[in-house]
Amino acid sequence: MQNTNLNTTQTAPSAAPSKSSHVDASKRQFLHGGATLGSALLLAGISNTSRAHEPEKKQLPKAGRSPHGSIIGHGDFQYKVDYNWGRLDPHKVPVENSHGLAIDAKGRIIMATDSDVNNFVIYNKDGKLLDAWGTQYPGAHSVKISHENGEDFIYIVDCGWVLDRNRPDNQWKNKWYRQSGFIAKLTIDGKLVYTIGHPVTLGIYTPDMRYQPTDLTVAPNGDLYVTDGYGSDFVIHYDSNGRYIRHWGGTNNADPALNLVNTHGVGVDTRDPNNQHLLVSSRGEQTIKKYSMQGKWLGDIHLPGAYVGGPVFKGEHFYAPVCWSHIDGKMAANSGFITILDKHNRVVSNLGGLAPEYVDGQLQPMQTNYQVFNHCHCVCVDDDENLYVGQWNANQMYPIKLERV
């Protein structure tokens, strides 16, 4: 089926797509929208350690007890929870949201956080702090490591939701304002290589269209695919130097199958080398959509009950964070889990959720068990198939390690 938005010259709609989905509404219930107060880089130099963290908050799942040491998961994919793995001194190395996680060639775990004290926190596999740095990326939302010519590079996605430096207190609803986001490529030690800004500069967005990117993936040939999941819901395709190629998606297609709703994450599926394609989360639809590398829609992976993020691949499986469960007709608070799918894109395990069930080949609605997570936002997998999970809106929780058993 041809996507009418898929070309290299066609501009996006003249008005920003309407965010009518309850995903966006729920996000705004938590995030305080308002006028932009200043540029991200001006804000970057403002440090506010006195109120950067609330260590008196209980960092527990909804069940109210620590899951440390418990065994979670189903079938061959079960894990022991190390709930204390990434904990640090919150007055020295604070986090707001553990938004993004990636592993470099040396096996270091790199976390991206939207703290105004440090945007990057670097761990070893034992949870020991190796480094913390950066304030230039106040809306840090996703981090990816790319191995290029024997060298590691960092791609950071700044989504534009930024801590308000003039916030009167540390209450969640008063902490944030929104501005445009951007993409940056860095050396592994944090030196800037280039940035990619608002698509209005390319003529593919109009000035009134929001741009708040949420994720990025690097294809085997070096091309970049960016999801504008908090903005106008397009996937934007660039070459390895950040030059525009095409875009597709949005919310105003004649064929609703081509729409994206809160397109939160993206990954390149290389499990079949002869059939590489993109998996793109349409989180508001509880769906992962399949596209060719040129943006042709190929089909959907429906994940009922799961407001799912982008895929992380390991071997024949992929792992995806679920930020909310759909329960009683709404997005349930503190209801996240991690879902794992096999090479046939069938769910084989839900970590922190109920066991997957298929009836006549159809996946039944999935949901949390409330025992482990609040809102799962990111996951990465090490060489031993252990998982590291970061969360959004989880009382400034550090990452959790899940040890494969």
Locations of regions flagged by a protein language model:
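Blade/loop signatures of beta-propeller domains
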Residues: 57-83
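Beta-rich, blade/repeat-based domains predominating
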Residues: 93-106, 137-150, 162, 182, ...
